[in-house]
Structures are given as C-alpha cells and as structure tokens.
Swiss-Prot record:
Chain intervals for the UniProt region annotation (G2): 510-514
Gene from which this protein is expressed: infB
Residue ranges of the region described as G3: 531-534
Lineage: Bacteria, Pseudomonadati, Pseudomonadota, Betaproteobacteria, Burkholderiales
HAMAP family, alphabetized: IF_2_B
Compositional bias per record (Basic and acidic residues), positions renumbered to this chain: 48-63, 120-181, 213-264
Organism: Burkholderia thailandensis (strain ATCC 700388 / DSM 13276 / CCUG 48851 / CIP 106301 / E264)
Region feature (G4): 585-588
Name of this protein: Translation initiation factor IF-2
Role summary: One of the essential components for the initiation of protein synthesis. Protects formylmethionyl-tRNA from spontaneous hydrolysis and promotes its binding to the 30S ribosomal subunits. Also involved in the hydrolysis of GTP during the formation of the 70S ribosomal complex.
Domain tr-type G: 476-645
Cellular localisation: Cytoplasm
C-alpha cells in the first residue's frame, strides 16, 4: 500500500516511527507526530540526507555489467580415428557506465573502439580456443562437467550455511528479547516489593535494597544461563550440521580430484602404452599356435612390443639371461636355416600399423626413423630419461692459469656461459683467452660451483722432498759479511785495504755499481765479504746482500753522518735479523766528529756497546789502516757467538749474487754457496735457468774445482741469464732440472700474460683519463742484471703526469741488431750501460737514425734522460705587461668602428701586442690590436708620452676614460 503518513512509511521500512521522525527532523522535514502526512518530496529530501550522511555516491551514475556467452563446436579426430565433437564456450564480460551528457560523444567513440577491440579479442580468443581444442579429448569435457558440479554443490553448501547463520541470528535475537522481558519483570517485582517494604519498614531500607540487588542479579544470571544454553544448543546443532556438510563436500572433492588426476595421467601417458593395453591376452596365444601348426605353416607366437625387444637379446645370448625355453617358445626350434636374424613372424606381426611419432605398432620396437637393421635395439627405457631436477655442484680445481674453454669443460657447461659471466663482470674474453687463477675462481663461484686452488703435477715438490731428506753432518763455516752504507762513505776502500787490493780506483766515477763477493783468509779464519753499492738506485742489490749475509758492517763517514742509504741499510739488516758492526770511517779527516755519528745512530735504533747496546762501534780509516784489525776482531767475535754451521758433504745450495751475459762465455752467474759443496760438472738449477757447470772461477779469476759453504764463485754453462737473488740448487739429473725450469718458464709466462690481460682495461681507462701524455721509449742494455734492474727502476721513477718513461726492452749483454730493429719499430732510444754495440748493430743504427747512448755512471744516465724529458714538456706561457694607455677621445669611423685616440702613459705599445680594456679598474674585454696609427700612418710601436690611434678587434664599446693594458705572451721552457 502507499505510505501516506509517517507511521505507514516506518512500517514499510521496518523501523521504529520515533527513529524515522528523528531522521526526518535531521533532513529538514518538520513532522510532529506519526500521523502527519508524508509527500514524495519529503521522501526525496530524506533520501538525499541519508546518502550524504552515509557517504553514498551520486545515484545518477550507474554501472551495468553484461556477460555474453558464445558457444561453438569443433570436430576433431582422435588417435583411434573416430570423429569427436568438442564444444567451445567463450565468455565475455562487458561493463557499461552512464556518463554525463557532455562526454556522450567521447563515450560513443570509446565504445566503438572498445567494440572493435572486443571483436578482435573475440576472434583471437576463438582462434586460440580452436588451437587448444585440437589437443583436448572427451575426458577434458567430463572433467569440466565434474568441476561445474562441484561448484554447484559448493554454492548449495554456502546457501545452507547462510540459512543456518540466519537461523542462529534469529535464535539469538529471540533469546535476547526473552532475557530483556525477564529482566523487566524482575525489575517491576523488585520495585513493587521495595515500595511495600519502604512503606512498612523505613528503618530497614538499606538491607532490603541489598536484597533487591541480589534478587535482580540472580534473575539476570538465570536469564543469561537460559539464553546461553539455548544459543549453545543452536550453535552446536548448526556446527554439527556444517561439519557433516563439509566432510561430505571434502569427500566429493577428493573423489573428483582423484578422478581428474587419473584422467590427466591417462592423457599424459604415451599412446604406445594405450596400444599395449588393448592387445589380446597371452592365454589366447597357445590355441592360435596350435591351429597354425595344424595348417602346416610355422609361426612365431605374437608378443607384445615390449617383450619382443627383450626376447631377441635373450635368444642371441642364452647364457646371460633366463633359460632359453623361457625366452623363445617351442616354435624357434623348428626355425628354417638361413632365415636370418629376425626369424619367422606371425600374421599379426607382419601387418604393421600406421607409423606415428608416438606409436610403434606391429610388435616391432622401432624408433621414428628406425631402419630394418636397428629393430629391437632401442628400448622404451631410452626415451624415459629424467633430467636432474637439482643443480649439480662440482668441485673445480683451478690451476694458476686456465683458458676459458678448459674452465667451461671442467664445469661441464658451454664456453659461451663462461663468456656471458665474464661480460657481466665487465670483461670481454674469447674462448681461447687465458685467465689467472683469481679471476677463474670468481667465475666458478658465480656459476654455483666450488672453486679449489689446484697445484697439480708440480715438479717443484721434488725439491721440497729433497730438502726434507737431507741429513748430512753440520760443520762450522766461514761468516758472510756484507759491507753496507751511504754512497762515498768508503765501503770499497775499506775492503780494498782488507784485501790489499785496489778495486775502488778502477771503478767508474769512484762509486760501486756492482755487488762484489770476496773471501779473505785471516789468522783467525776465512771471512767472506759482500760489497754492495751505496747509491739509492741499488736498493734491490742491498736487499739481496742483506738476505745472504750473517753479519753487516755498517760504514758511516765521520764527517758526513747518517744519510738516507745508511737508514735503508739499517732497515735491511733489522728485517733480516742480522747483527750490525758499525765502522766509523774517515776519522783521519780534520772535520770528523764520531760522537755526532753515534748520537745519530742511536736515534735510528743502533745503540753502541758503551751505551748498553749490542752493536760494536769501531773507528777506522781506510787510508791509514787505523782500526782495521779491531774491526776484523769484532766481526769474528760476532761469528763465534752465532756458531755458524752448514753441511759440507751434500749437494750444494746457494744464491745468485750477480749475473751477466758474456759474449764469449755466455751466461755467467756469481753464486754464493750457502750449504754443501759445488763441484765442476754438477747440474744446477737457478730459477728458470739450468745447466751443467762447465767452468768455475774464484773472485780473482782463477779456475777452481769445488766451492764449499760461504765461498763465492763464478759459474758458466747455464741455459740463460738467471735472475739476481734466485736460489741455486744442485740436482742429480739434468732431465729433472730441465723439466722444472720449463715448468717455471711456462708458469711465469702464463701468469704474466694473465695479469697483463686483466690490467688492459684499467690501463686503457687510465690513458683515456690522462689524455695526451708524452712517452719516452727506451731500450736498456747493461753489463750485469743488478745494474740493469737498478737503472730501470731509477728511470721509471722519473715519470710524471705529462711525460712518461716507457721501457720497451731491458736485458743483459751487448747491443745487437735485434735491439736496433726493435728501437726502429718502437722509435726508442738505446741506452748502453757498460756495454757497447757490435759493428753490424752500429751500421744498422746509423742507417735507421737510431740514437745509441753509452754510460758507465748511473748518475749521468739518469740526468740525461731527465733533460730529454724536460725538452718534451709543453712550454709554460707567461704574460708580460709592456705598457698602459689612456683613452682621451673616441672617433666613430664608417666601416671601421670605434677608434680610440690615446696617450701612452707607461711603457711601450707594439702592433703585435694583446690588450685588456679596463673600465673603472675592472677588466671588461681581452683581445688583440686591430690597428696602431700615428698621424694617419701605421706604426709598429709607440713609446711613452706620445699619442696614437688604436682600434681593437671585435670590440667597439670604447668610452673616454678607459684604460688599455698592453701585454705580450711569452713561452718559457719547463724543467722537471
């Protein structure tokens, strides 16, 4: 019925009339009672108010969703050849939104585009569905129907649950209503009783009030218990019912899933297995065979495809498998001779089925392209290979160098994978490129394998085993004493006096540039001396001397004190743990001050014995011989304290003090024997060099047959010049020495190449950052390796950010034609240190214009290279102010611009000078003079006190009162 008043409208809305009146009042509709009339306008105002207050959206815009279904049928033949009809259903969901009138045109266009896209999408999906339908079979349709049935059952279950929930809520509401009614009745009874008792007994009001409270609480508890019991019973019933329904649904779902799983397995099973399943059973074979025998024709019993392949090998090798009667039936015994490998077959086996990729029918187990000779060789198990699901982690032994291809082979992956990982790491490599050990281990770990640093098949392990096995008798040996100190402090002169020789007088420049080894016989025994250079360039030589020594004589000039190389010698001695004997030389000079030297040495940590230290200080003079005996006494005393011993009757071991390339003798090495005895004819190994000792000379150049511990000798017969500081060891077999030397050469070469390759990118980036850097290429040839090493290091230290020394090649020996050819190709300068070029090399150098420089003092070589580098530096530009000009008047000349009439106030103005324009002592322009005139004549210069006319290139903003600062730019040569 129509709701014409408030009460009827409240009944229609199923809400109290009082609440509706309050909402109408809030909406601005004034209604006093339930009987007041209510118009449609009032209802609309109430609806707007409720939408605004509850956050409802504008009702004008509405959204409509349409779902369209399109069903089509596709006919497809299955594996058995039967035609099956497959229904394809395409569902499409479309949403329409009502928009404003202003955007109707745009909406129509958008709708048209949407329709076109929808049609295209529909066609695409139909095509996809048709392609997918080709792979579907009848079981897929049955699975979809079961899933729909499950969905319907799930929807029914949800409906039942919602009904149970509604029933439970209704029961709770009834229980709450009953509880409220009981509470109201109890409260009314309590109030009546209280009124009666209050009228009768005013004095016991407080006690009666407490009784009323207790009664009210008891009534409320009773009502609550009753309501809770009812609600609990209803909830229990609903829960039992829901649990039963869920259990039933779960069972149905599990059954449906099991059935779907079986269908999927059946669909995924190869068709060969399905063909096997429909083959005739075995019991039917025997009657067929008997019938065939009755006809007089021999037949083999038909076998399944799987058994035929297994039966043939058994027939060939009866001893390897089951007994022969089990593998071949009785029909094989009657086989005709010459029938070949295949034998007789029954009619069913001769009728071959259609050849398909997944099916090999006809009882013959062949592949897709199996030939007549390959029958029965390929089993079904060959096609059932399962790829490993987990990645295989391998332990990869990485040597010091390895190529990319070998590294990939060790990890059982393609080389392209290793190249990809290297590209991700920022390095481009090829398949044959050699990687160093560190880079290769990082690549292995990036690919998920374990990298182990490998030292496999190292022939040097034999040397370690030989060291462990040597247990010869230890006998006393002479001490090895190294003389160290600053340059020009008298080390060689001191040794000359001890040896009664004059080595210092024959040295170039009066300075030692080689390490010398001598042994001196004294009344108290033999002492071996090593004389080291004091120049700063020979740091490596001094370090080798300290490594091979037992005692260090530190020579300090009494008039010079502690110098940089003195401090370096102290640090070398302390690093080697070698005792120091200090010789304060040149005490015969008037300016000598030994006490000052002692104080400086104490500051460096060398404390004399009189100050409580452990270093003897001996004042000596290499010229007069004062204190030489005391020095030797202290040295031998230190040697006795050290108790130096070494095995004598054992293969020799030592260290290379110096090495050089002699044109007549070949590679020559000065060796200090540290243990054992070195004999002529022994096979020695020194670093990458090996050979048999052909000749052995002492320090005086006299031949000797053997050298014991602490004796220096010069040996010949090595394959190449060994590195200074290399360990020398005697081996029993030349073949083993060659093997170890070649192994070291290959390892050194591979490591060097790998490091060069790793540093290529960095050096390229450095060169890009440096920009234009001048290079001074040099080829260095020296007489001995120590001098060559020192010269190379000294020259490399001269490099700056603008000029860099590039050592193209450095070696020991004379200058040959190959060196000149290398210098021609690299445009290098050849430096010969105590060496000369042969006749052919000199002619070739003159023809090609190659500069060859000879030096015998390291100072001169370093100074001349430094001067050449200074000449390669870009000159420095300096500005020199030559004059000041004041503008007195400005003239505007057509086609010329502004011309300033000026007065030269200071210096001179030249036509070729540059100029700065100053206005209020602020530079506003810098440029060049365009013209300089005096009385309409061009002049080259104007001196102070004269007037002139000037114009400036590309500048016309000249004002009276401006000043011109005239300057010239000069280039000044720079020095390092």
């Amino acid at each position: 019925m129509a709701s014409n008043n408030v009460a009827q409208f409240a009944a229609e809305l199923k809400m109290p009339a009082g609440v509706l009146l309050e909402q109408l009042q809030a909406a601005g509709v004034q209604k006093a009672s339930e009987d007041d009339a209510l118009s449609e306008t009032d209802k609309a105002r109430l609806l707007d108010h409720l939408r605004k207050s509850h956050g409802a959206t504008d009702g004008d815009k509405r959204k409509i969703t349409l779902t369209r279904r399109h069903t089509s049928e596709i006919k497809q033949a299955d594996a058995t050849g039967k035609a099956r009809t497959i229904q394809v259903e395409v569902r499409k969901k479309r949403t329409f939104v009502k928009r404003d009138d202003v955007s109707e045109t745009g909406a129509d266009q958008a709708q048209a585009q949407t329709d076109e896209q929808a049609e295209a999408e529909l066609k695409r999906r139909e095509e996809e569905a048709r392609r997918e339908a080709e792979l579907l079979e009848k079981q897929a349709q049955e699975l979809r129907e079961r899933q729909e049935r499950l969905e319907r059952e799930e929807a029914e279950r949800r409906a039942r649950e919602e009904a149970a929930e509604a029933e439970r809520r209704r029961a709770e509401e009834e229980a709450a209503a009953k509880r409220e009614a009981a509470a109201a009745q109890a409260e009314a009874a309590q109030q009546a009783a209280a009124a009666r008792e209050e009228a009768q007994r005013a004095q016991s009001e407080q006690s009666e009030q407490s009784a009323q409270d207790e009664a009210r609480a008891a009534a409320e508890r009773a009502a609550q218990r009753e309501a809770a019991k009812k609600a609990e019973d209803a909830a229990r019933e609903a829960a039992d019912k829901a649990r039963a329904e869920q259990e039933e649904i779960r069972k149905r779902r599990e059954a449906a899933e099991a059935e779907a799983r079986a269908i999927r397995e059946m669909m995924n099973t190869p068709r060969r297995a399905q063909v096997k399943a429909v083959e005739p059973p075995k019991p039917a074979e025997q009657p067929a065979a008997k019938a065939a025998e009755a006809k007089g024709t021999l037949h083999k019993p038909a076998k399944p495809a799987g058994e035929a392949a297994a039966a043939r090998p058994a027939a060939k090798k009866p001893a390897s498998g089951a007994p022969a009667p089990a593998a071949a039936p009785a029909g094989d015994r009657n086989k005709k001779p010459g029938t070949g490998k295949s034998g007789w077959q029954d009619d069913a086996a001769k009728r071959r089925g259609i050849k398909t990729r997944g099916d090999s029918s006809g009882g013959v187990d062949r592949g897709w392209r199996g030939g007549p000779k390959g029958r029965g060789k390929h089993q079904d198990s060959a096609s059932s290979f399962q790829a490993p699901t987990e990645p295989i982690v391998r332990e990869v032994h990485v040597p010091e160098t390895i190529s990319v291809a070998d590294l990939a082979h060790k990890m059982a992956i393609k080389a392209s994978e290793v190249i990809k990982v290297m590209m991700k790491m920022g390095q481009m490599v090829t398949i044959n490129q050699v990687l160093d050990q560190e880079t290769a281990m990082i690549v292995v770990e990036e690919l998920g394998h374990r990298a182990l640093a490998a030292k496999l098949d190292d022939p040097e392990a034999l040397l370690v085993e030989g060291e462990i096995g040597s247990d010869a008798e230890q006998l006393p040996r002479p001490p090895v004493v190294t003389v160290m100190g600053h340059v020009d402090h008298g080390k060689t002169s001191l040794l000359d006096y001890i040896r009664r020789a004059k080595v210092a007088a024959g040295e170039a420049g009066g300075i030692t540039q080689h390490i010398g080894a001598y042994h001196v016989e004294t009344p108290r025994g033999v002492v071996t001396f090593l004389d080291t250079p004091g120049h700063e360039a020979f740091t490596a030589m001094r370090a080798r001397g300290a490594k091979a020594t037992d005692i260090v004589i530190l020579v300090v000039a009494a008039d010079d004190g502690v110098m940089p190389q003195t401090k370096e010698a102290i640090s070398h001695a302390k690093a080697g743990g070698v005792p120091i004997v200090v010789a304060i030389n040149k005490i015969d000079k008037p300016e000598a001050n030994p006490d000052r030297v002692k104080q400086e040495l104490v500051a460096e940590g060398v404390v004399p014995e009189e100050y409580g230290g452990d270093s003897p200080f001996v004042p000596v003079s290499a010229k007069t011989g004062v204190g030489i005996d005391d020095l030797l006494e202290n040295v031998l005393l230190q040697a006795e304290v050290l108790e130096l011993k070494a095995p004598v009757e054992s293969p020799a071991k030592g260290i290379v003090i110096e090495a050089k390339l002699d044109k007549g003798k070949g590679p020559v090495a000065t060796v200090l024997v540290q243990s054992g005895t070195l004999n002529r004819g022994d096979v020695v190994l020194a670093g990458t060099a090996y050979g048999r000792v052909r000749a052995m000379l002492d320090e005086n150049g006299k031949p000797t047959k053997e050298a014991g511990p602490s004796i220096p000798v010069e040996i010949q017969g090595l394959s190449e010049v060994p590195g200074a500081g290399e360990e020398v060891i005697v081996l029993p077999d030349e073949r083993k020495a060659r093997e170890i030397a070649l192994f070291r050469q290959g390892k050194f070469r591979d490591v060097k190449l790998a490091k060069q390759q790793a540093a290529k990118l960095e050096s390229m980036l450095e060169q890009m950052g440096e920009g234009e850097v001048q290079n001074l290429p040099l080829i260095i040839k020296a007489d001995v390796q120590g001098s060559q090493e020192a010269l190379v290091q000294s020259l490399l230290k001269l490099s700056t950010n603008e000029v860099r020394v590039q050592i193209v090649h450095s070696a020991v020996g004379g200058i040959s034609e190959s060196d000149v050819n290398l210098a021609t190709a690299s445009k290098a300068v050849i430096i010969g240190f105590n060496t000369r070029a042969d006749a052919q090399a000199r002619k070739l150098a003159e023809a090609n214009g190659i500069d060859i420089r000879y030096y015998n003092i390291i100072y001169d070589a370093v100074d001349e290279v430094k001067a050449a580098m200074s000449g390669m530096l870009a000159p420095e530009k300096r500005e020199v102010v030559t004059g000041m000009v004041e503008v007195r008047q400005v003239f505007k000349v057509p086609k010329v611009g502004a011309v300033a009439g000026c007065m030269v106030t200071d210096g001179v103005v030249k036509r070729s000078s540059s100029v700065r324009v100053l206005r209020n002592n602020v530079v506003i322009f810098t440029g060049e003079l365009d013209s300089l005139k005096r009385f309409k004549d061009d002049v080259k210069e104007v001196k102070q006190g004269f007037e002139c006319g000037m114009s400036i290139k590309n500048f016309n903003d000249i004002v009276e009162g401006d000043q011109f600062e005239v300057f010239e730019v000069t280039e000044v040569a720079r020095t390092l």
